[in-house]
């Protein structure tokens, strides 16, 4: 999503959550 690209720091955290299968 664009909002992830807009905030790399948050996107990195989201990536970790995605890897864990959180959200």
UniProtKB/Swiss-Prot annotation:
Domain of life from the UniProt record: Eukaryota
Cross-link (2'-cysteinyl-6'-hydroxytryptophan sulfoxide (Trp-Cys)): 3-7
PTM text: Processed by the macrocyclase-peptidase enzyme POPB to yield a toxic cyclic heptapeptide. POPB first removes 10 residues from the N-terminus. Conformational trapping of the remaining peptide forces the enzyme to release this intermediate rather than proceed to macrocyclization. The enzyme rebinds the remaining peptide in a different conformation and catalyzes macrocyclization of the N-terminal 7 residues.
Covalent cross-link (Cyclopeptide (Ala-Pro)), residues: 2-8
Gene Ontology molecular function, alphabetical: toxin activity
Signal peptide: none
Job of this protein: Major toxin that belongs to the bicyclic heptapeptides called phallotoxins. Although structurally related to amatoxins, phallotoxins have a different mode of action, which is the stabilization of F-actin. Phallotoxins are poisonous when administered parenterally, but not orally because of poor absorption.
The family this protein is said to belong to: Belongs to the MSDIN fungal toxin family.
Name of the protein in its database record: Phallacidin proprotein
Organism: Amanita rimosa
């Amino acid at each position: 999503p664009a909002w992830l690209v807009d905030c790399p720091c948050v996107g990195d955290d989201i990536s970790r959550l995605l890897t864990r299968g959180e959200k």
